[in-house]
Amino acid sequence: MADQLTEEQIAEFKEAFSLFDKDGDGTITTKELGTVMRSLGQNPTEAELADMINEVDADGNGTIDFPEFLTMMARKMKDTDSEEEILEAFKVFDKDGNGFISAAELRHIMTNLGEKLTDEEVDEMIREADIDGDGQINYEEFVKMMMSK
């Protein structure tokens, strides 16, 4: 399944993997997974974290290595995000709940994920997704952006 990914996708997933793999040892532990999820405003229990790891932990060693992570991402891409998942993601970005993602909200989330973006990069992301040109991303624009990935 992971062999259906483009080089660009694999590079993107490698970057995402490094954000999770805080100590850089090549594996994601439940602790590291929890840290990232909490930085995104989620509050998973230890049991939920263990379940998430076990779901993709092919060799059963209790951690996720990069090949296992790729398989998980490929699987997720295949059952392309349900409307519900996209709405949840939108709510994570839309901190003040006003129905729009502002440049400041986008910058805040990306920084929490460990992605240090310049103001230009954040503005560029907004511009790419901002179909009606109002300087922020509404839900419809967010859905289009998520579906086009």
UniProtKB/Swiss-Prot annotation:
GO terms for molecular function: calcium ion binding. Calmodulin mediates the control of a large number of enzymes, ion channels and other proteins by Ca(2+). Among the enzymes to be stimulated by the calmodulin-Ca(2+) complex are a number of protein kinases and phosphatases. It comes from Saccharina japonica. Ca(2+) 4 binds at D130, D132, D134, Q136, E141. The modification N6,N6,N6-trimethyllysine is found at K116. This is Calmodulin. The modification N-acetylalanine is found at A2. Belongs to the calmodulin family. Residues 8-43, 44-79, 81-116, 117-149 form the EF-hand domain. It holds the Pfam family EF-hand_7.
